[in-house]
């Protein structure tokens, strides 16, 4: 495998069919996620496929902000979250309880789970958009295809794969009529679905496109680099504590001596002592908490 293909997004367009597509392979970015928490094997598959899918779905958005995919389950897998920003940075985390390995995805998620897609602008959080649908399908790819069809009315084909070394995916999406012959979509997506997981994980974008679509007219765009990045910061944690309120923070300080927050995505620790809290709220929060108890 050529290192040039590592952590790369490749967008492409068909000249003779109403289809646009993208291929992504995550190596270093995926390893950064795995290095931060010991995920069970079954959860690695889900999280890796979601990570690849988030980059593919964000690839066609003209949008300054982040696309967030969430799967909420009621079984052993409680939550899987992936965020991809328009600068092609990604992060991911998950919560689970109990044994996950050896069970199909539906069993891991339990009954009544839901899929949430959020578009969060970087500057104006009031313009955040969210779509929520029931989980339908036996794989992350099927669930996302169903979401796109129900929520966006977009025919989509997703092939996703995740292993210990890399996570990868290909997205094909039908464009409105007028972008080539109508039956072009059926032909292209059928070809696309012949792509195997080991090919996705083992071949570069150029080889995959040639193998699948050598009889089609494919226009490729410049490759883009994808990387892991967590945008947590002490300032953001401070804002969160401010929203919690001085009384709550004072109570924790009274009981534990400090407030410690650990980022779910990157495991960065943020510790706030009494002096930090007093600066944050502009009054003695511990004295106030002590007084409230008497």
UniProtKB/Swiss-Prot annotation:
Asked if the keyword Glycoprotein belongs to this entry, the reply reads no
Q: How is it modified after translation?
A: Under oxidizing conditions two disulfide bonds are formed involving the reactive cysteines. Under reducing conditions zinc is bound to the reactive cysteines and the protein is inactive.
GO CC entries: cytoplasm
Localized where?
Cytoplasm
Instruction: Return the InterPro entries for the record.
Output: Heat_shock_Hsp33, Heat_shock_Hsp33_C, Heat_shock_Hsp33_N, Hsp33_helix_hairpin_bin_dom_sf
GO MF, one example: protein folding chaperone
Tell me yes or no: is Magnesium among this UniProt entry's keywords.
Answer: no
From the UniProt record, give one GO term of the biological process aspect.
protein refolding
The record's keywords, sorted A to Z, are:
Chaperone, Cytoplasm, Disulfide bond, Redox-active center, Zinc
What CDD domains has UniProt attached to this entry? Hsp33
| Record-annotated disulphide pairs | 230-232, 263-266
| Signal peptide, first to last residue | none
One Pfam family name from the record?
HSP33
Role summary: Redox regulated molecular chaperone. Protects both thermally unfolding and oxidatively damaged proteins from irreversible aggregation. Plays an important role in the bacterial defense system toward oxidative stress.
NCBIfam families in the record, alphabetically?
PRK00114.1
Similarity comment text for this entry? Belongs to the HSP33 family.
Q: What is this protein called?
A: 33 kDa chaperonin
Give the source species. Answer: Chromobacterium violaceum (strain ATCC 12472 / DSM 30191 / JCM 1249 / CCUG 213 / NBRC 12614 / NCIMB 9131 / NCTC 9757 / MK)
């Amino acid at each position: 495998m050529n290192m040039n293909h590592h952590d790369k997004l490749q967008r492409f367009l068909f000249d003779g069919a109403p289809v646009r597509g993208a291929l992504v392979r995550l190596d270093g970015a995926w390893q950064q996620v795995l290095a931060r928490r010991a995920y069970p094997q079954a959860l690695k598959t889900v999280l890796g496929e979601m990570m690849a899918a988030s980059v593919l779905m964000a690839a066609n958005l003209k949008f300054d902000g982040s696309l967030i995919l969430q799967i909420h389950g009621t079984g052993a897998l409680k939550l899987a979250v992936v965020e991809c920003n328009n600068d092609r940075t990604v992060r991911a985390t998950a919560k689970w309880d109990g044994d996950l390995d050896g069970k199909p995805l539906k069993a891991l998620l339990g009954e009544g789970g839901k899929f949430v897609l959020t578009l969060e602008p970087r500057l104006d959080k009031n313009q955040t958009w969210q779509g929520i649908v029931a989980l339908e399908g036996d794989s992350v790819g099927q669930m996302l295809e169903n979401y796109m069809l129900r929520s966006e009315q977009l025919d989509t084909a997703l092939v996703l794969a995740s292993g210990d070394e890399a996570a990868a995916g290909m997205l094909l999406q039908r464009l409105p009529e007028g972008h080539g012959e109508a039956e072009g979509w059926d032909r292209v997506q059928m070809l696309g679905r012949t792509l195997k997981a080991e090919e996705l994980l083992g071949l570069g974008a150029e080889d995959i496109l040639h193998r699948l679509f050598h009889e089609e007219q494919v226009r490729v765009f410049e490759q883009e680099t994808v990387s892991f990045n967590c945008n947590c910061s002490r300032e953001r944690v401070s804002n969160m504590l401010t929203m919690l309120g001085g009384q709550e923070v004072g109570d924790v300080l009274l009981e534990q001596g400090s407030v410690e927050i650990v980022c779910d995505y990157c495991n960065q620790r943020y510790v706030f002592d009494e002096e930090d809290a007093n600066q944050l709220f502009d009054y003695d929060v511990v004295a106030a908490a002590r007084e409230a108890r008497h």
